[in-house]
């Protein structure tokens, strides 16, 4: 169906005109820092002006000023990204929509190079167990656009690369406590020090606790998490270094239903705790063979586990007790990657490498009788950067991936960056990517009850395919202490995957299971930009805006089941809307950071988002949200620290996940807390 809505073409012109005519040039004696160097796109350290696609960099100051407690919230500041808070549903982070899965599988998430994608969570990311504390993040590089060339099929629409702080910068002791409404009770302890003469370490313990959204209707929401994280960096000699990461993150969420009252829960879905853990270890060896050449070998181990066990008592004679644990599963990943960066002299630079990954999953519920299911993936990749002229940078990338469940695929990318001068760059690029399904999609086989055959995987399920054209502009106006990043995109997704019930008649004894299959071709078009401006020394502004239009067409094969999900007009329309309205047609974010007298620091984050859908049968209505933070850093004898007061949703309650006008709606109410941090 072709949407009648089109994004306004005047947005960029308005932004540029306001810069050109509405501001006064800043004092040139005041230094405005250069645009950062990023390595998340091509795996080569590159200026933003040379990178083959758009990148948003979120630094430590932005993270702190945004007033977030949960990491997923910070991506509201990135053009094209959407998220919502932890509720009884898992939090998601998506780019350009298509977010119907519980654990978003189309944006790769990395922490110090380690993928957060899990075979347990549908080959997606579980934000409840993200193993990093906000205070330990140095910066986040967000690649806005497909990057399967560099990171594989999970980087289908983009990459979030989280880089943690060098332990050498965190020596000493740091303690923080937060206390506020909705039972916010957070504690953190960080210890950093030296490892003899060879390196430094950082050890962090963090605990978060809150009652989340106000209890409504038949559900109770609460969330708590614990994290232990260790990092050590050691210089083995002048050319070799070793980085060690290890730890565990745990998230506990309330799930289940009350059937409209707290005394009588649903026997088959009682109120209970869903416990999830992420245990990890990583070794990274780096070798500098010359000033222009280095190599890296990385091994990572990650184990994800979940559990929500309960008993069902059937009143027979004698009574029968059934032990149910739908989430009692385990997913384990071993990954080995080699990466080499080399200078080719006048020919350019190249980053190339190879990786091997072994995923296993065990689940008595969705993989009954199959024991431990294994999946192996091997990749080779390369990215070349050339500068044939001072006004031109070219990037060429190619990757091949062989998946034991999905087969072999290629991912190419080509871009050209035209530098009009040192301040203005135009970028044109094309890329192709493929996204594979999860172990569940290829191997699951289970009944949901004695009368319903719920799901049977298709071992020959095809992959999603993406062709992307983009036109970008990057302005680095140092005299004005401002930068502007613009991306126009045309993304065509072929064979979008979705779970379809081939017999939705709900007749007892139904033996035709659902499966994941291609249902649509999707086209995503739009424009997004981010403006960073420091009009005065104590003032920083970050403005982001996105206009997006999604069209979709059903495939004939998806409509071929006369009793299937898509044979019902309501489901046909709802799934079509779930695709086309899976991202807001217009979304805006603004972050204002202001230094005040007496060392006070003030910040305001504002978000304006149009109506969209996170689930098939509900809507997230249009909303505005404002978060504020006021902080006072201090020094007392040998102690330093900060007192901060934060308010989220200052303008009151609103909906971010779903809204249907009944008590089950998820309403985000005002939340406020006070934080004290002491550093020694």
Predicted regions and their residues:
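Extracytoplasmic beta-strand/coil segments of soluble accessory domains associated
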Residues: 35, 40, 47, 72, ...
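N-terminal periplasmic accessory domains that precede
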Residues: 71-74, 92-96, 107-112, 127-130, ...
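Surface-exposed extracellular loop regions of Gram-negative outer-membrane beta-barrel proteins
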Residues: 99, 252, 258-263, 360, ...
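Short acidic/polar hinge/loop motifs at secondary-structure boundaries
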Residues: 115-144
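Periplasmic-side early beta-strands and strand-to-turn transitions of outer-membrane beta-barrels
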Residues: 148, 161, 168-170, 178, ...
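Conserved C-terminal beta-signal and adjacent last beta-strands/turns
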Residues: 192, 234-235, 428, 541, ...
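Membrane-embedded beta-barrel scaffold of Gram-negative outer-membrane proteins
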Residues: 199, 294-310, 419, 427, ...
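Gram-negative outer-membrane beta-barrel transporters
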Residues: 387-390, 490-492, 515-612, 654, ...
